[in-house]
Amino acid sequence: MRAAGREKILSAPFDLIIFDCDGVLVDSEVISCRVHAELLTAHGYPISSDQVRRRFLGRSAWEAGREIEAELGRALPSDFDAQLKAAIFREFATTLEATPHMHETLAAIALPVCVASSGAPEKIRASLTRTRLHDRFAPHIFSATQVRNGKPAPDLFLFAAAQMGVPPARCLVIEDSVPGVTGARAAGMAVFGFHGGSHCRPGDEAALLAAGATANFDDMRELPAMIAQATDYTADIAST
């Protein structure tokens, strides 16, 4: 693939690239879904990792827990979230990797970047540190814990844009989940759907497009050229 030049990147119709973390920057979703499913099953809510992926991908663990408690008719253990976090951290410490070609992709993007993730701050920090991505984004790392409503609401994306001083219409979001795409579009932003993580399944591309993704891709090496060659999506967003 021909690498896009810095000049082209800077001439794109965007002033900020907002990255989701899990499933976009780091290939973590397959790990998180498996651990989440195992812990829920152990606490009396039998569920597979694929079911966790389909139901809760892109949403916060807190929201997932409240939904499950409503179905169970009882509360999960008071320390369930802490158990889940600890179990995921143990797995991440030895197995988590950056999404393939992520480092070279970020090196080719000269535009400002930030992270907007449904994860808790400590989880985001651990994920990015483990994969040597933290310093590329810090301190511009934003969590759903900083806003009232998580994805699919637009709150987190609007918060990130405001913190970075960029109008929503000049932002491009990179997302792997339907809630993330939905939230980005509700915020008035263009969004590229990424379906190249190890957790992705047939049909994900169509689901991202149906949710409003401006374009889709499955190889991070494609992203710099996609940004450089992008037409002005603001008119498209304004008309939808």
Set out the residue ranges of the language-model regions:
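A short, Lys/Arg-enriched amphipathic alpha-helix followed by its capping loop at the start of a domain
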Residues: 39-43, 101-111
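Residues at secondary-structure transition points
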Residues: 27-30, 52, 56-59, 75, ...
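Hydrophobic alpha-helical core bundles mediating ligand binding, dimerization, or RNAP-core interactions
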Residues: 32, 36, 40, 61, ...
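Helix-loop "lid/cap" segments that line or gate small-molecule binding pockets
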Residues: 39-40, 60-75, 127, 161, ...
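Active-site neighborhood of HAD-like aspartate-dependent phosphohydrolases
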Residues: 2-54
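Asp-based, Mg2+/Mn2+-dependent phosphohydrolase catalytic module
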Residues: 2-15, 107, 111, 120-240
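Metal-dependent phosphoesterase signature
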Residues: 66-104
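Short helix-capping segments at alpha-helix termini
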Residues: 42-46, 72-75, 132-136, 165-166
